[in-house]
């Protein structure tokens, strides 16, 4: 999971993360830390093809999705979300939030395709390096 996330960070453009993560940080932030709710992984050919996690952030359940750039638009994200929905419902989550860079065209398309709807927009959201990319906030209601 760490290797995939760090490849996505290195490529840039589809995540607000700009600094590579350690395996310990990925584990704490996405798998079994105190703020983690769910985590699902898609594997194939002996490697991680994608993963999705929900965790508490600012009082809301937020989702993060990371799919190998060479495997996007092949149903991996939809498969992850189907499994995530089962776990989210079992955890009693009413609403899943997604915060997406406004310049992340594939991410915006993915979350729209699986049923997330816009509820806020921050045109001034900036990355750590100062670039303003904007941020779209979307949600998926489970009830």
Each language-model region and where it sits:
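Conserved catalytic-core motifs of GNAT/GCN5-like acyltransferases
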Residues: 56, 97-101, 112, 117-134
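Conserved short alpha-helix immediately C-terminal to the canonical SAM/SAH-binding motif I
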Residues: 80, 104-107
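Acetyl-CoA-dependent GNAT
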Residues: 11-70, 81-83, 87, 124, ...
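A beta-strand edge to alpha-helix "cap/lid" segment located at domain peripheries
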Residues: 76-77, 81, 99
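Glycine-rich phosphate-binding loop
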Residues: 71, 75
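Short amphipathic alpha-helix that is part of the acyltransferase structural core
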Residues: 1-17, 137
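Conserved GNAT acetyl-CoA-binding A-motif
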Residues: 88-100, 108-110
């Amino acid at each position: 999971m760490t290797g995939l996330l760090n490849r996505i960070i290195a490529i840039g453009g589809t995540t607000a993360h700009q600094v590579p993560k350690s395996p310990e940080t990925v584990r704490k932030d996405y798998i079994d830390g105190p703020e983690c709710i769910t985590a699902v992984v898609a594997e194939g050919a002996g490697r991680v093809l994608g993963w999705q996690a929900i965790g508490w952030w600012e009082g809301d359940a937020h989702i993060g999705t990371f799919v190998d750039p060479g495997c996007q638009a092949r149903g991996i994200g939809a498969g992850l979300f189907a499994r995530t929905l089962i776990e989210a419902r079992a955890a009693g989550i009413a609403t899943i939030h997604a915060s997406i860079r406004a310049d992340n065209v594939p991410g915006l398309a993915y979350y729209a395709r699986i049923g997330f709807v816009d509820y806020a927009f921050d045109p001034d959201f900036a990355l750590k390096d100062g670039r303003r990319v904007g941020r779209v906030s979307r949600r998926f209601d489970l009830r």
